[in-house]
Amino acid sequence: MPKHGKKYRKATDGTDLAVRFSVEDAVAKSLEASFAKFDETVDVAICLGVDPKYSDQMVRGAVTLPNGLGKTVRVAVFCKGEKQAEAREAGADIVGAEDLVEQVKGGMLDFDSAIATPDVMALVGQIGRVLGPRGLMPNAKTGTVTFDVAKAVSEVKAGRVEFKVDKAGVLHAPLGKVSFGPQKIAENLKALLDTVQRLKPSSAKGTYMKTMSVSTTMGPGFKVDPNDIRRFLEG
């Protein structure tokens, strides 16, 4: 059983972490339990009733959070011609095609998100083994393979979150910073859950959102009552 430090134990003192809370209470308690000296990120983990080993039950997508993520995101755009000017005007930090691919091959990974136009995806495929494991590979399902680079860059800069269910059927996503306060975090969570709900596979049986937990970077996870998730979505 993992040992926790004094600050963690103090943050959870008097709290039964086995209890399941309403969505709003889980968010509020996770913020109250934050004890790090830095502005921690608030995260959510959602266990979905899907089996990712079947391609038709893979849940993957993206959502632009209404209150952003509270951090500066560096964006790289792989494109050619006039699209390069569009990307720069939209605020892209790094823009290029063959030259950018060569830089990445050389070890340059100074960006948090990557976007590509469809006509250069064969080129970007050369660095798939570098970008893929880091979650940086552009993908049409998440809107990062598109000719509308200006829109894509703007959305990423505004707080666009990409998510993908893991092998265990769990989806992880950031919701912002502790300094946002409970209302803004709850609003971001609502936007995420609405999107995840819309992506429910038709082949998924039984309860879709089975369990959910909200936590901060260093803090404990507060579990949500599964019955309250539906109430929160409909509210």
Curated annotation (Swiss-Prot):
Record-linked CDD domains: Ribosomal_L1
Protein name: Large ribosomal subunit protein uL1
InterPro entries noted in UniProt: Ribosom_uL1_bac-type (IPR005878), Ribosomal_uL1 (IPR002143), Ribosomal_uL1-like (IPR023674), Ribosomal_uL1/biogenesis (IPR028364), Ribosomal_uL1_3-a/b-sand (IPR016095), Ribosomal_uL1_CS (IPR023673)
A GO term for molecular function: tRNA binding
Keywords: Repressor, Ribonucleoprotein, Ribosomal protein, RNA-binding, rRNA-binding, Translation regulation, tRNA-binding
Gene name as annotated: rplA
Gene Ontology terms describing biological process: regulation of translation; translation
Domain of life of the organism encoding this protein: Bacteria
Keyword Phosphoprotein: no
Record carries keyword Transcription regulation: no
Gene Ontology CC entries for this record: cytosolic large ribosomal subunit
Description of how the protein assembles with itself and partners: Part of the 50S ribosomal subunit.
Cited Pfam families: Ribosomal_L1
Protein's job: Binds directly to 23S rRNA. The L1 stalk is quite mobile in the ribosome, and is involved in E site tRNA release. Protein L1 is also a translational repressor protein, it controls the translation of the L11 operon by binding to its mRNA.
Similarity comment: family membership: Belongs to the universal ribosomal protein uL1 family.
Natural source organism: Oleidesulfovibrio alaskensis (strain ATCC BAA-1058 / DSM 17464 / G20) (Desulfovibrio alaskensis)
SUPFAM superfamilies: Ribosomal protein L1 (SSF56808)
